[in-house]
Amino acid sequence: MARYTGATCRLCRREGMKLFLKGDRCFTDKCAFVRRSYAPGQHGANKKKVSNYGVQLREKQKARRIYGILEGQFRTYYEKAEHIKGITGENLLKLLEMRLDNIVYRLGYGSSRNEARQLVTHGHFLVNGKKVDICSYHVSVNDVITVCEKSRSSEKFKTFVENPKTLPKWLEANVDNYEGKVVAEPSREDIDVPVNETLIVELYSK
């Protein structure tokens, strides 16, 4: 599957805020955004007037970059969200939250979504007892995500278990069993991403 291979820190600078794409590094002074919080490029430090379209586009780009999704796949998620009963923007975020790589990140098995994505593609997880290595796999309510038996001896997973993450209320975990479960769909209030999904809907509605 195609993916972004450029400098990750440039994405945060482009959006004008930390997107926490590098996990723990983003909380240190080594974070590039701390040193240069303006947009990348020769004229990045110069403030420009942004049109309504530009604001909407930036919001969509921000959401894509937070979840690590390319344009075509993001549009597919939007089209699915349109056909689900409810508010399209909220439906979009819920679909993104229910991706396997995001669930793994939310459970604490990865300091960033990018790291969680790598762990999934390397085959470290089971969903309902079956190995799944597809990051975009849609996890459903009552699905159980488990770390593979052979992966549990890894220092990386031991560290995650020794330092459990605070979970959103729609997830629960059995740390000793290296297991997590989706107990409900996330509500909009549960999704702590700095995105105004209404602007994304306005962009795609044109």
From Swiss-Prot:
Task: Pull one GO CC term from this UniProt entry.
Answer: small ribosomal subunit
Molecular-function annotations in GO = rRNA binding; structural constituent of ribosome
Query: Which GO terms fall under biological process for this protein?
Result: ribosomal small subunit biogenesis; translation
Gene3D superfamilies attached to this UniProt entry:
Ribosomal Protein S4 Delta 41, Chain A, domain 1, RNA-binding S4 domain
Pfam families assigned to the protein according to its UniProt record, in alphabetical order: Ribosomal_S4, S4
Source organism, top-level taxon: Bacteria
Function summary: One of the primary rRNA binding proteins, it binds directly to 16S rRNA where it nucleates assembly of the body of the 30S subunit.
What name is this protein filed under?
Small ribosomal subunit protein uS4
Species of origin reads Clostridium beijerinckii (strain ATCC 51743 / NCIMB 8052) (Clostridium acetobutylicum)
